[in-house]
């Protein structure tokens, strides 16, 4: 299933699905201390859903993560010790919840196959949201480095579908906060000073002709 949702409607979507159940869905977030994950965890706690966060032992002992972890605890989030690379810990965690939300980062996108395998073994997950939160990879023609990342996301989608796991893909398009600090420079950490990298051949158009699109939209009326 394809959906384009923001954080608020993300959990409204879960509420609508919950009408068929007697109580609120229990939600587990993987990667919840990362760039996007922390906002998903916060939204889950505020929504009233029992919210669980999979955390590694190393994360709990990381001083840099301590304030964030403490804020999660104060908001009622339940911490579950586990690891993406520990199959048994994933299965054990999944058996305690109804919904799994993955917010793993770029380097772990391909490793979501481990989540899929654990969901299949647990056998109780009602909905899986893989780490997406960008362009709809089945409808986007990208250049590198995005092309490789999109291909990995597409592979994960096909694996989810092949296993028959109930799912929703959340495609919310680009994040200005991710691209603007570096002026969209790949692997940059600050705005460019000496040169600018232009992806592709430099001739790609974001919008070919806005007027044409407007009249195509109103044509049926």
Task: Please report, for each region that a protein language model flagged, where it lies by residue.
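An anion/phosphate-binding loop that grips the pyrophosphate of nucleotide cofactors and donors
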Residues: 97
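Oxidoreductase cofactor-interface core, primarily capturing Rossmann-like NAD(P)-dependent enzymes
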Residues: 2, 8, 22-75, 79, ...
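The conserved beta1-alpha1 loop
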Residues: 103
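Receiver (REC) domain switch-region micro-motif
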Residues: 100
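Cytosolic, low-complexity regulatory segments enriched in Ser/Pro/Gly with interspersed Lys/Arg
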Residues: 5-11, 15-19
């Amino acid at each position: 299933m394809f959906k384009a949702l923001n954080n608020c409607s993300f959990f409204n979507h879960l509420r609508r699905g919950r009408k068929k159940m007697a109580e609120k869905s229990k939600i587990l977030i993987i990667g919840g201390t990362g760039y996007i994950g922390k906002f998903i965890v916060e939204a889950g706690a505020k929504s009233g859903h029992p919210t669980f966060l999979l955390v590694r032992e190393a994360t709990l002992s990381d001083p840099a993560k301590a304030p964030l972890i403490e804020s999660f605890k104060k908001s009622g989030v339940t911490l579950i010790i586990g690891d993406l690379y520990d199959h048994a810990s994933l299965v054990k965690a999944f058996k305690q919840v109804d919904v799994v939300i993955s917010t793993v980062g770029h380097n772990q996108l391909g490793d979501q196959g481990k989540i899929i395998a654990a969901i299949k073994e647990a056998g109780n997950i009602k909905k899986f949201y893989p780490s997406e939160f960008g362009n709809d990879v089945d409808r986007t023609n990208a250049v590198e480095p995005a092309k490789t990342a999109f291909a990995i996301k597409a592979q994960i989608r096909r694996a989810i579908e092949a296993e028959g796991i109930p799912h929703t893909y959340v495609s919310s398009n680009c994040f200005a906060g991710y691209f603007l600090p570096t002026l969209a420079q790949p692997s940059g950490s600050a705005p460019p000073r000496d040169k600018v990298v232009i992806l592709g051949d430099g001739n790609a158009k974001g919008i070919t002709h806005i007027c044409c699109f407007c009249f195509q939209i109103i044509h049926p009326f």
